[in-house]
Amino acid sequence: MSRYGNAPPPYEEVVSVATPSYVQQPWVPPRYFAPTEGRNSIVYDQFPTCYDTTKLFLVDNKSADITDLNMQNDHSHFATTVVQNSEFTPREASTQHITLDNRSRWGAKLKTLIQTNLPSVTDYMYTNSLRVKLMESYDEATGTATYEWHDITLPEGNFDSGRIIDLLNNAIWELYLTYGRQNGVREDQIGIKFDTRNFRLGFDPLTNLIMPGHYTYEYFHPDIVLMKGCAVDFSKTRLNNVLGWRKRYPYQPGFVITYDDLVGGDIPPLLDLAAYLKKPREGAGGPIIRALQKDSKGRSYHVQYTDLGEVTGYRSLYLAYNYTSDVTHLRKSTVRSWLVLTAPDITGGAQQLYWSLPDMALAPTTFRPSGQTPATFPVVSTEPLPIAARTIFNAQPGYAQIVNQNTSQTMVYNRFPENAILMRPPQPFMVQVPENVTTVTDHGTLPLQNTLSGVQRVAVTDSRRRTCPYVYKCAATLEPHIMSSRTLQ
């Protein structure tokens, strides 16, 4: 017997044996031999099945659509035909359909274009009104006063940040003319002033006075000056964003700033320069250092004595935010605990837009597909509202303000030029203006329904799900493609 066992079988014997099953070619179902046959077909009602792709155009101002479809709509909520056939009227196109092969899951790359003409002060964006609490009446004999809340409304328009502050102060003055003046309230008791200065520059801690005798007339940040009993309510407005003040916890309800909130923000009185510059009397010692009590027209600064020294009857939000620890020796300002100073935003804090294509896109599982109004349409994409705040540097704001006052007769903004607190605030050297920016956005792939109507509804809503009347151009393109097979579960 051989040491290595039997010899291997001959070649002819091996090849004559049937091939084992584990080395045979696998069996392939018929549909895999033609993987694209009919699975990417797009069917128009008037054409036979075609295998090429198509583009869908959503345009807000097709002339053929306006009369039949959009007489009661606008550029942010409209209907448009997507069957590209000029022989069809919009009514006929509404009976047509585009059928995407239902054996596949379809998606489309969504690209949009939006143009807006949104002004900075408008009722739509809640940037034209706020509530203020002012002195309603004053009894000189008893010294008692009553305070009431009033709504002030600015005229709508596209204004810069400095003009908005001027309009706010003018609205406060008009309220005084309507109510307070008729009931014994003096001009120095108006109680609310919007300003832009830092009233603490030049402060002497020894005398508690502004020793230069004048408040520095330079722009720092929008400020709110209040007297006792007065308040400003920003609960239903975005003007606080325009002024650069926000709540530290913005989702909490209510936003009221009162005089009592501005602890440590007392505006220091001015040095009485007229008394200081007088020659000292014989044996009187040095110059007279005392607080200025009233302006040249007799309007009082309401100077009063406190534990911290002499202060005026006015409190500044800007001072309370920045200088409370210096004045009251507190570790942290009470205003800082719930307020935050921000860069002014002339847009009022413009938010986002939502896209809805209720007749085309598959609704997300969290939305009910039964919505019949723009406020209830399923949201398929979002983008920022196309408006931005642009900053323009003005190296000579004071010169520009003087020229403007003398050429444009803007004395109405400076009704009390003799009063150091009530005078017109300085204009900013960094002027903000709103700019509507055309945006082209790629939203990625959007899942599509398999049957598309020849007329499609398009809705672009704001953060409150309202249609936006300031959208004046809205267009979109969709390029359908297959995402996957519907048989793959």
Swiss-Prot record:
GO terms for biological process: endocytosis involved in viral entry into host cell; virion attachment to host cell. GO terms for cellular component: host cell nucleus; T=25 icosahedral viral capsid. Induction: Expressed in the late phase of the viral replicative cycle. It is found in: Virion; Host nucleus. GO terms for molecular function: structural molecule activity. Keywords: Capsid protein, Host nucleus, Host-virus interaction, Late protein, T=25 icosahedral capsid protein, Viral attachment to host cell, Viral penetration into host cytoplasm, Virion, Virus endocytosis by host, Virus entry into host cell. InterPro entries: Adeno_Penton_B. Belongs to the adenoviridae penton family. Major capsid protein that self-associates to form penton base pentamers, each in the shape of a pentagon, situated at the 12 vertices of the pseudo T=25 capsid. Involved in virus secondary attachment to host cell after initial attachment by the fiber protein, and in endocytosis of virions. As the virus enters the host cell, penton proteins are shed concomitant with virion acidification in the endosome. All late proteins expressed from the major late promoter are produced by alternative splicing and alternative polyadenylation of the same gene giving rise to non-overlapping ORFs. A leader sequence is present in the N-terminus of all these mRNAs and is recognized by the viral shutoff protein to provide expression although conventional translation via ribosome scanning from the cap has been shut off in the host cell. Interacts with the fiber protein (via N-terminal tail region). Interacts with the capsid vertex protein; this interaction binds the penton base to neighboring peripentonal hexons. This is Penton protein. It comes from Murine adenovirus A serotype 1 (MAdV-1). The lineage of its organism: Viruses, Varidnaviria, Bamfordvirae, Preplasmiviricota, Tectiliviricetes.
